[in-house]
């Protein structure tokens, strides 16, 4: 067996150009496979984390009749005693934090510019606000009655900076419209322009007073130490006239897109591997026909058909190892670089999902192992037919072929 591998190595050395092209095809294939796996994993990882941290949380507690699409602050749709409920939930095992939030629809305007916005009343001290990175100014304090925090894209469109004034109109609990001036205390960025341009944050107490919600809230926003425990924690939350939803319940589209992306990457992998198989088969067939006389001599000297198959598979395996080594290095470098700087896609979004402006590829070790093993096995399988063809050549006909 060792002698066959030595022969295979010499054969590859005698045909350096063909060997290099075959290894290059495999290395390019593996590079693409690794980068695409990292890209789609990074995309779904980012959209999942952003959607959970900014929108749904791991668990939400709502009033039974609350409709998040309407953003109504009518009392019958809101939770009573939200601070007390949030404190009870926060005391449960596995809960990282729980905080009340109030949602209302409104219009922000400055001069002759205006924009529809979602008003979110938050507890300024809650760690749930960490995704709202303040890039200018500061977060309004809990007792601030005229301060507001706005997204960077909204500040740009309304031509506002910290300290400027804007008018905010809100639909109140009584079904009326109220309007008040606010001072821009700070400007935030979450990394998603689509989200940031439609959100303004107020201290919860001010949002309640401004909208006429009293001491009520729209939801209790809950984050866990492990999101996979959402169902177990949700089962432990009970109360009258409330509805408890897990992140899977609230993000069916996100889960579906995640499953679809797995199927999509599988199809792309098959296409790339199919092209690679074609290149390898053609290269190996070319090698067989170019070495017809050599095969005839080996057969005449007593080499069995099985040994010829092993010889060609040994050549294929050595090519695979070389191509895989280069592919692993280039794929890792590519994924690492873009995983650090990101790939800018700009203002994009899908209803029901929050996506950042940049996608950061994320290469997982299990993907590296899976794709590496797959590439090696595919190379051997692609080489088997040419090897089998070589093993079936008759010595006399093979020797006559190049006379």
Question: Which residues fall in each region the model found?
Answer:
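Hydrophobic alpha-helical transmembrane segments of multi-pass inner-membrane transport and secretion
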Residues: 16-43, 259-294, 317-326, 374-381
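Hydrophobic secondary-structure segments that place a key small or acidic residue at a functional site
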Residues: 102, 113, 117-123, 135-205
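Hydrophobic, regular-secondary-structure patches
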Residues: 37-116, 143-144
């Amino acid at each position: 067996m060792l002698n066959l591998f030595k022969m295979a190595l010499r054969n590859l050395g005698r045909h350096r150009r063909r060997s290099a092209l075959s290894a290059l095809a495999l290395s390019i294939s593996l590079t693409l496979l690794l980068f695409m796996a990292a890209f789609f994993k990074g995309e779904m990882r980012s959209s999942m984390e952003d959607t959970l941290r900014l929108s749904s949380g791991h668990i939400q507690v709502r009033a039974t009749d609350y409709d998040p699409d309407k953003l109504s602050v009518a009392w019958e749709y809101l939770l009573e005693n939200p601070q007390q409920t949030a404190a009870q939930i926060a005391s449960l095992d596995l809960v990282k934090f729980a905080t009340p939030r109030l949602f209302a629809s409104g219009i922000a305007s400055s001069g002759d510019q205006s924009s529809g916005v979602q008003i979110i009343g938050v507890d300024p001290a809650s760690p749930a606000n960490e995704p709202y990175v303040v890039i200018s100014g500061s977060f309004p304090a809990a007792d601030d009655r005229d301060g507001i925090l706005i997204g960077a894209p909204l500040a740009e469109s309304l031509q506002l900076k910290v300290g400027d004034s804007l008018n905010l109109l809100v639909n109140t609990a009584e079904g009326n419209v109220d309007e008040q001036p606010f001072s821009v205390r700070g400007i935030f960025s979450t990394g998603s322009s689509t989200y940031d341009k439609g959100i303004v944050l107020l201290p919860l107490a001010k949002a309640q007073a401004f909208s006429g919600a009293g001491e009520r809230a729209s939801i209790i926003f809950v984050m866990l130490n492990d999101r996979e425990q959402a169902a177990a924690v949700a089962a432990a939350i009970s109360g009258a006239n409330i509805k408890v939803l897990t992140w899977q319940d609230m993000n069916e589209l996100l889960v579906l897109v995640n499953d679809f992306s797995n199927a999509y990457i599988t199809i792309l992998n098959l296409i790339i591997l199919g092209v690679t198989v074609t290149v390898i088969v053609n290269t190996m067939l070319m090698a067989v026909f170019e070495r017809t006389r050599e095969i005839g001599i080996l057969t005449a000297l007593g080499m069995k058909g099985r040994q010829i198959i092993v010889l060609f598979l040994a050549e294929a395996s050595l090519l695979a190892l070389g191509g895989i080594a280069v592919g692993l290095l280039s794929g890792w470098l590519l994924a690492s670089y873009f995983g650090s700087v990101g790939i800018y896609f700009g203002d994009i979004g899908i209803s029901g999902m929050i996506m950042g402006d940049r996608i950061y590829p994320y290469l997982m070790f299990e993907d590296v192992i899976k794709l590496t093993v797959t590439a090696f096995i595919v190379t051997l399988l692609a080489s088997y037919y040419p090897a089998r063809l070589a093993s079936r050549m008759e010595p006399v006909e093979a020797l006559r072929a190049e006379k």
